[in-house]
């Protein structure tokens, strides 16, 4: 008897998930494999996937357009949280995993599957994100992970697939592993496994090399409503369209490349390349607007919440009680994060050059050093005396 009768497989069309189809049937005795590919903004890349899955042995191939849901329910909360794992990575790939897990669980219920499966290896973070998210949504649903058990190298995996007529989507001489959605691309493996190796220009697709970017800067204005991006250069746009347009504008100016050594949840370090033009610019603009409208204590406390939120999402705990509690705090802080941020895009850099909001806490007549100054300078002496009292008492008590 096989490990399951009917399985819904998270499918990308890549090497591992394609090989999973014959492997589940030939090695694990699965009778029927239904593939599910989530369209999260890949666009034309998903065109041949449906037929490829069927050619590889799937009984049914599902392609679900979840791009709007992805942006609305996953990317936008990440912007409100200013999510940057280890201060750099905006979670472009990690954010997709809980949504794909949700789609898998829903498809399993709809098609009467007794298990779901994914093609994650035992060294990555995605296996945790999928397994934990699926368990949170349906603790009784079995999860199969062939690539975690089959013990094949990437070259052996490609060879196994070729035995069943599955063409390799990459050259064996340069086997990059690439994941893409509307928010950006992640690239790893191959020559990138050497942390000293400079990525070749062939690695990038969304961003221009600095040498090829325009010699004149571009200025853009981003409008936010309660922490959510709503306008680009004064034009109201749907969430997906806004990110698409901003990806093109920022990528044209070489903005959005990340090359980092990342600490994975499983305890190893990994060299990762990311391209996330729009997401990085939106987080930068959102952070700046918050500095204008939030009180100092809320802003400072939120930094710790943001770090915890980013770690939870990176580590696969999107559906955890702690993240839900942090979500509530973040949403409370966003009620007055409404306004406009102006940025200068030039030669790989996005620089905030202006911001405005009707909710602004910036008081010109309190901040100015000119004749309009209304700050009570005489009050400073008493404030300093009280503020410094603990330090003064400590010094008086312990001085030699």
Curated annotation (Swiss-Prot):
Location of this chain's protein in the cell: Cytoplasm
Catalytic activity: L-citrulline + L-aspartate + ATP = 2-(N(omega)-L-arginino)succinate + AMP + diphosphate + H(+)
Binding site for L-aspartate: 121, 125-126
MF-aspect GO terms: argininosuccinate synthase activity; ATP binding
Enzyme superclass (EC): ligase
EC numbers, comma separated: 6.3.4.5
Pathway: Amino-acid biosynthesis; L-arginine biosynthesis; L-arginine from L-ornithine and carbamoyl phosphate: step 2/3
SUPFAM superfamilies: Adenine nucleotide alpha hydrolases-like, Argininosuccinate synthetase, C-terminal domain
UniProt keyword annotations, A-Z: Amino-acid biosynthesis, Arginine biosynthesis, ATP-binding, Cytoplasm, Ligase, Nucleotide-binding
Transmembrane segments: none
PROSITE patterns: ARGININOSUCCIN_SYN_1, ARGININOSUCCIN_SYN_2
Pfam families, per database record: Arginosuc_syn_C (PF20979), Arginosuc_synth (PF00764)
Residues that, per the record, bind L-citrulline: 89, 125, 129, 177, 186, 262, 274
CC terms in the record's Gene Ontology section: cytoplasm
Annotated binding of ATP, by residue: 10-18, 38, 119
Coiled-coil segments on the chain, per record: none
GO biological process: argininosuccinate metabolic process; L-arginine biosynthetic process; urea cycle
Keyword Cytoplasm: yes
Matches recorded under PANTHER family: ARGININOSUCCINATE SYNTHASE (PTHR11587:SF2)
Family statement: Belongs to the argininosuccinate synthase family. Type 1 subfamily.
Subunit structure: Homotetramer.
Name of the protein in its database record: Argininosuccinate synthase
């Amino acid at each position: 008897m096989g490990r399951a009768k009917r399985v819904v497989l998270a499918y990308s069309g890549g090497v591992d998930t394609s090989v999973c189809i014959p492997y589940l049937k030939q090695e694990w005795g699965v009778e029927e494999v239904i593939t599910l590919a989530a369209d999260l903004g890949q666009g034309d890349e998903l065109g041949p996937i449906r037929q490829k899955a069927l050619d590889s042995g799937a009984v049914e191939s599902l392609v679900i357009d979840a791009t709007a849901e992805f942006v609305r329910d996953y990317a936008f909360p990440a912007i409100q949280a200013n999510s940057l794992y280890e201060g750099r990575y905006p979670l472009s790939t990690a954010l997709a995993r809980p949504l794909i897990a949700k789609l898998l669980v829903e498809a399993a219920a709809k098609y009467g599957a007794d298990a779901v499966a994914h093609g994650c290896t035992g060294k990555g973070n995605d296996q945790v994100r999928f397994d934990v998210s699926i368990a949170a949504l349906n603790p009784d649903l079995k999860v199969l992970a062939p690539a975690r058990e089959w013990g094949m190298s990437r070259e052996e995996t490609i060879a196994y697939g070729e035995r069943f007529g599955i063409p390799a989507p990459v050259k064996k001489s340069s086997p990059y592993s690439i994941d893409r959605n509307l928010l950006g691309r992640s690239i790893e493996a191959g020559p990138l496994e050497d942390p000293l190796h400079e990525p070749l220009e062939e690695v990038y697709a969304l961003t221009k090399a600095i040498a090829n970017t325009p010699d004149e800067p571009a200025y853009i204005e981003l409008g936010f409503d309660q922490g959510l991006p709503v306008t680009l250069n004064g034009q109201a746009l749907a969430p997906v369209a806004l990110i698409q347009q901003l990806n093109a504008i920022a990528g044209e100016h070489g903005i959005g490349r990340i090359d980092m050594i990342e600490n994975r949840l499983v305890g190893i370090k990994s060299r990762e390349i990311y391209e996330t033009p729009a997401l990085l610019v939106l987080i930068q603009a959102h952070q700046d607007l918050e500095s204008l409208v939030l009180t100092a204590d809320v802003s400072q406390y939120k930094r710790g919440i943001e770090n915890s939120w980013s770690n939870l999402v990176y580590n696969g705990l999107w559906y955890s009680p702690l993240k839900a509690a942090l979500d509530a705090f973040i949403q409370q802080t966003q009620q007055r994060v409404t306004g406009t941020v102006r940025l200068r895009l030039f030669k790989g850099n996005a620089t905030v050059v202006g911001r405005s909001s009707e909710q602004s806490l910036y008081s010109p007549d309190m901040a100015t050093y000119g004749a309009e100054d209304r700050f009570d300078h005489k009050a400073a002496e008493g404030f300093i005396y009280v503020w410094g009292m603990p330090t003064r008492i400590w010094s008086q008590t312990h001085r030699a």
